[in-house]
């Protein structure tokens, strides 16, 4: 019963124009008015529905999936409130769009959310405190180079462990492509991660990425902390580039395949037990194969 009460209070009801009562305090506060969204098409393929969450129950299901993966599976450090509610949430959730994939026929669970991505456009982020990525990386060059309305941050990507055969991530990217076209997005950015915080173990991978996938100077991105560790060593590149590439995390490989580039440095996130890179994709530079597959 306590869990249900907490979930009801932590429902981000301000998304629907109400007040938020936080945990045991009766204090409520007025939130920013909601910015009207453009109509986003709901995509149905077989048993799956891909859409933007537009109900508090859908958002809570996405947050529950995130919690199960980031905190239970990946062992991120949880706060007391998150342990009680079993939801992953932060202040950015209240102004972001939440892309979800629903399995309509998952046995025993109606309308199960099995995949999610959080989307934040630059004009929205600038009104509510900025991108999540800007808490780890200096995005000045990108913000100075693009109309903020044309920048889209991707984050909080996760897929249920029973659905990691590539299908759900493909569906999410189909929907992201629709979002890109709808809002005429010119650049994608976000944090892509290596699990763990031991930099030395990743010396080959980090050296390979810096040597082969660095951003051009005019939109270069720097870590907010000094991450020029001695791991960046060309001697680490004796191993075949292909052999290093195939060992990269799937999400990083995916971004690189479509034409992404990475930040000059990295950020160690001890709370999430990750080493983060900022990945940037200029949509005009998306590889032709993927542009034909998703954007045409």
Predicted feature locations:
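Short amphipathic alpha-helix that is part of the acyltransferase structural core
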Residues: 38-114, 118-123
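Basic, polyanion-binding surface patches
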Residues: 292
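C-terminal "cap" of GNAT-fold acetyltransferases
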Residues: 273-285
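Acyl-donor binding region in acyl/amide transferases
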Residues: 119-261, 266-275
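Conserved N-terminal entry element of GNAT/NAT acetyltransferase domains
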Residues: 4-56
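Short loop segments at secondary-structure junctions
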Residues: 104-106, 123, 162-163, 283-286
């Amino acid at each position: 019963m306590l869990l249900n009460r907490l979930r009801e209070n932590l429902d981000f009801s301000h998304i629907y124009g109400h007040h938020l009562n936080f945990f045991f305090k009766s204090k409520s506060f007025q939130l920013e008015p909601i910015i009207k969204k453009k109509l986003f098409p709901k995509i149905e393929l077989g048993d799956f529905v891909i859409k933007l969450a537009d109900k508090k129950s859908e958002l809570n299901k996405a947050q529950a999936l995130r919690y199960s993966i980031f905190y239970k599976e990946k062992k991120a450090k949880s706060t007391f409130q998150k342990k009680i509610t079993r939801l992953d949430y932060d202040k950015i959730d209240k102004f972001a769009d939440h892309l979800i994939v629903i399995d309509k026929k998952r046995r025993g669970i109606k309308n199960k959310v099995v995949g999610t991505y959080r989307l934040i456009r630059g004009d929205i982020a600038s009104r509510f405190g900025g991108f999540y990525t800007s808490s780890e990386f200096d995005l000045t060059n990108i913000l100075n180079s693009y109309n903020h309305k044309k920048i889209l941050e991707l984050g909080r990507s996760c897929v249920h462990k029973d659905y990691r055969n590539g299908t759900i991530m493909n569906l999410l990217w189909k929907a992201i492509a629709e979002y890109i076209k709808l809002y005429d997005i010119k650049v994608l950015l976000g944090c892509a991660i290596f699990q763990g915080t031991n930099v030395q173990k990743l010396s080959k991978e980090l050296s390979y990425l810096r040597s082969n996938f660095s951003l051009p100077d005019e939109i270069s991105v720097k870590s907010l902390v000094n991450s020029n560790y001695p791991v960046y060593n060309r001697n680490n590149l004796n191993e075949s580039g292909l052999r290093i590439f195939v060992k990269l995390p799937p999400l990083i490989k995916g971004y690189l395949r479509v034409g992404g580039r990475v930040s000059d440095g990295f950020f160690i996130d001890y709370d999430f037990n990750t080493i983060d890179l900022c990945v940037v994709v200029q949509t005009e530079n998306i590889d032709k194969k993927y542009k034909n597959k998703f954007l045409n």
